[in-house]
């Protein structure tokens, strides 16, 4: 299992939200490039990046920052937020990003996901963000009404091999992941599952590993010092 540190970008800065609420955004680091470098120095093999501005309104103001992070640190990175078309996928890959995360568009336009997977294979990841077991869209502001497991099974059936599952109620709360939902998801699909939301202790990492989860995204816990990234990476191996 691997631990993947997160950089959430808003107005070019590293921020964190609580439960996906943009009103709670607060800066957690001054410099995204230096932040990514610290993550790499701690042993991270992949950096998870989210463009919060793009997720909310489709603007791409943070793309220059993403490109700079990859160019200056050599980081292997995945990026999500506001990716709604094949043109968006190609634009993001041109930044040097290794994997593209499709979120809301996967709910509305599964044919787009199928096309992206057919062309780019393992470079396509679907982000499933759930609240009370239903999939949310548009920066978590919209409710699709679809059960997260049914949606994951549908994505796997069209060729998706990587899923990031976020329990919105756990996000940014430092209260541990939703092990029950993750166990149910693990029992339902065979593709790679990366857990996001609430990962904050070495015990959380061990618990996810025991469930057979393939990766864990750590955000707020790393910034607050609650979770030592190097130790978490070691625990996951």
Pin down the residues of each PLM region.
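Active-site-adjacent beta->alpha loops and helix N-cap segments on the catalytic face
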Residues: 3, 54-70, 84-90, 104-125, ...
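N-terminal beta-alpha supersecondary unit
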Residues: 13-60
């Amino acid at each position: 299992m691997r631990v993947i540190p997160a950089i959430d970008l808003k107005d070019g800065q590293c921020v964190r939200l609580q439960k996906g609420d943009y009103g709670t955004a607060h800066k957690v680091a001054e410099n995204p490039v230096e932040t990514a470098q610290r993550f790499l120095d701690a042993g991270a093999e992949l950096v998870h990046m989210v463009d919060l501005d793009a997720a909310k309104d489709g603007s791409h103001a943070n793309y220059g920052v993403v490109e700079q992070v990859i160019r200056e640190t050599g980081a292997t990175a995945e990026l999500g937020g506001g990716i709604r078309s094949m043109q968006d996928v190609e634009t993001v890959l041109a930044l040097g990003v290794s994997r593209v995360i499709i979120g809301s568009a996967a709910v509305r336009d599964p044919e787009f996901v199928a096309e992206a997977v057919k062309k780019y294979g393992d470079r396509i990841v679907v982000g499933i963000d759930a609240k009370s077991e239903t999939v949310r869209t548009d920066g978590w502001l919209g409710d699709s009404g679809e059960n997260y497991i049914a949606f994951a099974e549908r994505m796997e059936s069209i060729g998706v091999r990587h899923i990031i599952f976020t329990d919105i109620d756990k996000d940014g709360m430092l209260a541990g992941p939703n092990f029950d939902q993750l166990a149910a998801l693990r029992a339902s699909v065979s593709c790679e599952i990366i857990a996001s939301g609430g990962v904050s202790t070495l015990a959380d990492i061990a618990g996810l590993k025991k469930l057979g989860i393939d990766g864990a995204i750590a955000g707020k816990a790393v910034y607050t010092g609650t979770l030592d990234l190097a130790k978490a990476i070691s625990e996951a191996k």
